[in-house]
Amino acid sequence: MRIVITGGPSVGKTTIVSLLEGLGHKVVHEIATQVIKEGKYLPWEDRVRFQSEVLRRQLTAEASILEYERPVFLDRGAFDGEAYYVFDKLPVPPVFSTIDPSQYDLAFLIEELSFFDANEVRREDLNFTREISIILERCYTSRNIKVVRVPAMAAAERVDFILSNVRTHQKGRVRSAEQAAVMFRAMSPVASAPF
């Protein structure tokens, strides 16, 4: 089960992902921050090269996830990159149309906090966070990926909110799979025939 934690800069995504990891959940840390810290590709110097490198690494990281039943939390998903292309009014690379959206079970859009914390990696402002959040939500919902908004509250409360929604979603998946199996057996003469 792959779950995206998304949202604009300085909304608390990394804190949430770190708390989830501390609880024993498998996580994929934000690729963009890693790329910026390396210093070779910087978004304020060449947004296209930066986004291309982030997407390449993101897809590699996601391809290495072999866990399908237990939740794996991603600090941003592949479609986050598309949102930045859209925001910057750059041509969206065709590779985004080849990414299977069904690999994501849920996306949590982390809403802004009452403060904004800029640093050497985060050079944007609160207006940017608000605008990119709208585009991020659209990039996921346009692919029928369920997006759940996580309101501003203490980080531990946000984690509880996310985990509660994940449990509810997991229960729904089990019921859906069981219902599909029952329907298949009822409709298929081969499935109901004794062997």
Language-model features, listed with the residues they occupy:
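Conserved lysine of the Walker
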Residues: 13
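Glycine-rich phosphate-binding loop used to anchor ATP phosphates in small-molecule kinases
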Residues: 52-102
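Conserved substrate/cofactor phosphate-moiety recognition/catalytic segment
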Residues: 19-60
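Hydrophobic positions on the alpha1 helix immediately C-terminal to the Walker A/P-loop
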Residues: 16
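Hydrophobic anchor at the beta1->P-loop junction of P-loop NTPases
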Residues: 5
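P-loop (Walker A) phosphate-binding loop of NTP-binding proteins
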Residues: 8
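A glycine- and Lys/Arg-enriched "phosphate-lid" helix/loop adjacent to the NTP-binding pocket
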Residues: 89-159, 170, 174, 178-180
